[in-house]
Swiss-Prot record:
Its EC number is 2.3.1.117. The gene is dapD. It comes from Rhodopseudomonas palustris (strain BisA53). It catalyses: (S)-2,3,4,5-tetrahydrodipicolinate + succinyl-CoA + H2O = (S)-2-succinylamino-6-oxoheptanedioate + CoA. This is 2,3,4,5-tetrahydropyridine-2,6-dicarboxylate N-succinyltransferase. It is an enzyme of class 2 (transferase). Substrate binds at residues 108, 145.
Length: 281
C-alpha cells in the first residue's frame, strides 16, 4: 500500500478506534502491520528532522503503534528466567532471528537487552541490558548503557551515549504530542531523565542526574536566558535550583528544580564524553 493510502487508512481507523479489536481483519490490520514493519526497518520514523532543524511528527505512525494494542491479543512469550514466560501483546524485535539476521543488522545486543517490535536499531549500536520500546529509533553508533530505557517513539541520533540508568520518556502514556528527541553526538549522563517531548540538540551534554520535562526551566548561567522544552546545541547542562518565592508568612519559599547551562562544549568536555570506536567493531 502506498504511504499516502497507508496514512489515510490508519487515520480513519484511529478515528473509529472503538470499533477496532483483535477480531478486526482486512485493510486496517494490513495497514497497521505494514506501518509497524516500516518502523521496524527504519524506512519511516515517527519524527523526522527538516533542513531548517525543525522536527516534524508523523502522527499517523504514532496512531499505528497505538492501534496495534487493540488489534493484537495477549499471548505467551517464551524466554523468561527459569523457563518462565511473559504475557504481552508485543513480540520481541529479535523473534525468529538467527546469526545471519543479526550480522546483517550490524548492531550488538548483549544478554538482557530487550527491544520490542517496530523499534529501529542502527548499525554499530551497542545495546547493554536495557529496554527499547516500540516505535523508537536509535541511530548508528549509539550506546544504550545498562538499565537505560528508550521510551516509545523516542528518536535517538547518531553517536549518542546514553549512560547507565537513563530514562528517555515515551509518548504513549501519558499521551504526548511529540516524542523525546536526542540529536546526534549528545552525551546523556547516568540516571538523567528526559521526558515529555523535550528536544536535546546536537552535541549537548547532560550531566548525571539532570531531569528535563516540558516545563523544566533551563537557565543559561552566562546570559540569563531561559529555555523550556529544548536544550541548545553543544550546551553542558547540570542540575540546579531557582530560588522560591516568599511564602505568605514572609519565610523563604522552597526552591524549584531547574537545569543550568554552565558552558558550551569544549575540547576538555569532548575528551571526557567521546565514544569509544573499539566497542562498536
Amino acid at each position: 500500500m502506498p504511504l499516502s493510502a497507508l496514512e489515510s487508512t490508519i487515520n480513519a481507523a484511529f478515528d473509529a478506534r472503538d470499533t477496532v479489536s483483535a477480531a478486526t481483519k482486512g485493510e486496517v490490520r494490513d495497514a497497521v502491520e505494514q506501518a509497524l514493519d516500516l518502523l521496524d526497518k527504519g524506512e519511516v520514523r515517527v519524527a523526522a528532522r527538516e533542513a531548517s532543524g525543525a522536527w516534524v511528527v508523523n502522527q499517523w505512525l504514532k496512531k499505528a503503534v497505538l492501534l496495534s494494542f487493540r488489534l493484537n491479543d495477549m499471548t505467551t512469550i517464551s524466554g523468561g528466567p527459569g523457563g518462565a514466560s511473559w504475557w504481552d501483546k508485543v513480540p520481541s524485535k529479535f523473534y525468529g532471528w538467527g546469526e545471519n539476521r543479526f550480522r546483517d543488522a550490524g548492531f550488538r545486543a548483549v544478554p538482557g537487552a530487550i527491544v520490542r517490535r517496530s523499534a529501529f536499531i542502527g548499525k554499530n549500536v551497542v545495546l547493554m541490558p536495557s529496554f527499547v520500546n516500540l516505535g523508537a529509533y536509535v541511530d548508528e553508533a549509539t550506546m544504550v548503557d545498562t538499565w537505560s530505557t528508550v521510551g516509545s517513539c523516542a528518536q535517538i541520533g547518531k553517536r549518542v551515549h546514553i549512560s547507565g540508568g537513563v530514562g528517555i520518556g515515551g509518548v504513549l502514556e501519558p499521551l504526548q504530542a511529540g516524542p523525546v528527541i536526542i540529536e546526534d553526538d549528545c552525551f546523556i549522563g547516568a540516571r538523567a531523565e528526559v521526558a515529555e517531548g523535550v528536544i536535546v540538540r546536537r552535541g549537548a551534554v547532560l550531566a548525571m542526574g539532570v531531569f528535563l520535562g516540558a516545563s523544566t526551566k533551563i537557565v543559561d548561567r552566562t546570559t540569563g536566558e531561559i529555555f523550556i522544552g529544548e536544550v541548545p546545541e553543544y550546551s553542558v547542562v547540570v542540575p540546579g535550583a531557582l530560588p522560591g518565592k516568599p511564602m505568605a508568612n514572609g519565610e523563604p519559599g522552597p526552591a524549584t528544580a531547574c537545569a543550568v547551562i554552565v558552558k558550551r562544549v569544549d575540547e576538555r568536555t569532548r575528551s571526557k564524553t567521546s565514544i569509544n570506536e573499539l566497542l562498536r567493531d
